[in-house]
Amino acid sequence: MHTMNGDNFANSFPKNPLLSRNSSSSNVIQYSDEFSPDEDWLNEHAAKEHEERIRRPSVNRAWQKNSTSGGPSVSLEKREADVASLGEVMDLEEVPRGITRQARQLNEYIFPKHRFRNHLVDEGKIPLVLVACGSFSPITYLHLRMFEMATDTIQEQTNMELVAGYFSPVNDHYKKEGLAPAYHRVRMCELACERTSSWLMVDAWESLQPSYTCTARVLDHFDEEINQKRGGITLSDGTKRPCKIMLLAGGDLIASMGEPGVWSDKDLHHILGKFGCCIVERTGSDVWAFLLAHDIMFAYRGNILVIKQLIYNDISSTKVRLFIRRGMSIRYLLPNSVIQYIERYALYRDAEPVKTIFYQSPFVRMEP
C-alpha cells in the first residue's frame, strides 16, 4: 500500500528523460473537442455569433451611460429581450452528455466523479488529484490554463499520474468584494469545465457549507471522498492505491500564507505536510526566494511543486469585473458560455470600492 507524504512526493521526481506530451507514453490526459466552444459556435450559430458580437458594445454601454450608480438601468423589457437573444445562441441549461451538475442544497450534494479516472495507465506511478480553491468570481481562462500548466509540469518532472482536477468555489461566508452568489459561481465553473475540458470537474461542497470553511478542511473533504470512501485507485490486481491530493494555487492564496494572522500555523502544516501544493509562478519571478523567506513553506519545500508560466498571462477576475462595470469587452478572457451567463443574470454591475487592480506578485493570481 502506497502512503502519501512529503518524503515519497520528493522521491517521485524521475531520473529518466522527460516525457513529451506528444510521445508514445500513455500517461497523458486524453482531450476531446466534443464540448469545444469553437464547435458549438460553428455552422448554425455562426451568423448569430456575428450578430451578437456587433450588438454587444451598444448593449453593454447602454446601461453605463444611463446610470449614475455604476449599476444597470436598462428597462426590464430590454433586458428580457437581451436574455432571449442570448438563449437563442446557446442553451446554458443544456447538460452535455455524461455530465453531472452539482446540487444547490447540501442535503442533495453528491461528490462529482463522472470524469474521475478509475485506473492508472502506468501503475508504477502515484495517482494525483489537483484541487483549486478560490472565489472564481468569475472563472477565467487563466484558472483553466493553470490546470494545463500543472499537467505539463507533473508529467515532465514527477512520478505522478494525474487522474482528476477539481474547482472548489468558496461559499458566501467568505466576505470579499465582487463575490457573486455561490450558486452563480458554481454554475459558471461548471459551464467553463463542461464546454472547454474533458477532465475537469466542479465540487460544490465548500460553497454549500453553512459557514466559512478553511482550505485545510476542504482538502480533508477530498481525501475523505476519494481515499476513505472510494479507496483511491483500483490497480489491475484488484488492490487499492490512495491518491495524492494537492492544492493548485495562484498568487493571492500563496502570498497570503506569508502574511501574519491570515493562516494558522496548524493549517499550513496540515496543508503542506499532508497534502502538498502546486504553485503557479509569475513569468520572470523567482518563487524560491519567497519560499526561502517563509519558515513553514521552506520546511515543506519537498512537498511543493513550482509551475513556471512560460507564456505570460495576467488575466484576473478583478480586472474582468472592472471591464464589465465599464462596459468594455471581456471576450477571449473567459469562455463564451460564462460571458453569456454573466449577461443573462446581469452579474458584476454593482460598483466596488476603489483598490489597486494591477497587483504585483511573484505568483499567478487565483483570487478574487
Curated annotation (Swiss-Prot):
EC number from the UniProt entry: 2.7.7.1, 2.7.7.18
Enzyme's top EC category: transferase
Residue segments, region Disordered: 1-25, 47-78
Catalysed reactions, as listed in the record: beta-nicotinamide D-ribonucleotide + ATP + H(+) = diphosphate + NAD(+); nicotinate beta-D-ribonucleotide + ATP + H(+) = deamido-NAD(+) + diphosphate
Cofactor(s) annotated in UniProt: a divalent metal cation
Cited SUPFAM superfamilies: Nucleotidylyl transferase (SSF52374)
Pathway where it operates: Cofactor biosynthesis; NAD(+) biosynthesis; deamido-NAD(+) from nicotinate D-ribonucleotide: step 1/1; Cofactor biosynthesis; NAD(+) biosynthesis; NAD(+) from nicotinamide D-ribonucleotide: step 1/1
Gene Ontology annotations of biological process type: NAD biosynthetic process
Magnesium found in the keyword field: no
Protein keywords: ATP-binding, Cytoplasm, NAD, Nucleotide-binding, Nucleotidyltransferase, Nucleus, Phosphoprotein, Pyridine nucleotide biosynthesis, Transferase
GO terms of molecular function: ATP binding; nicotinamide-nucleotide adenylyltransferase activity; nicotinate-nucleotide adenylyltransferase activity
Binding locations of NAD(+): S135, F136, T215, G250, D252, W263, R282, N313
Subcellular location: Cytoplasm; Nucleus
UniProt function note: Catalyzes the formation of NAD(+) from nicotinamide mononucleotide (NMN) and ATP. Can also use the deamidated form; nicotinic acid mononucleotide (NaMN) as substrate to form deamido-NAD(+) (NaAD). Key enzyme in both de novo and salvage pathways for NAD(+) biosynthesis.
Family per similarity comment: Belongs to the eukaryotic NMN adenylyltransferase family.
Protein name: Nicotinamide/nicotinic acid mononucleotide adenylyltransferase
Species name: Schizosaccharomyces pombe (strain 972 / ATCC 24843)
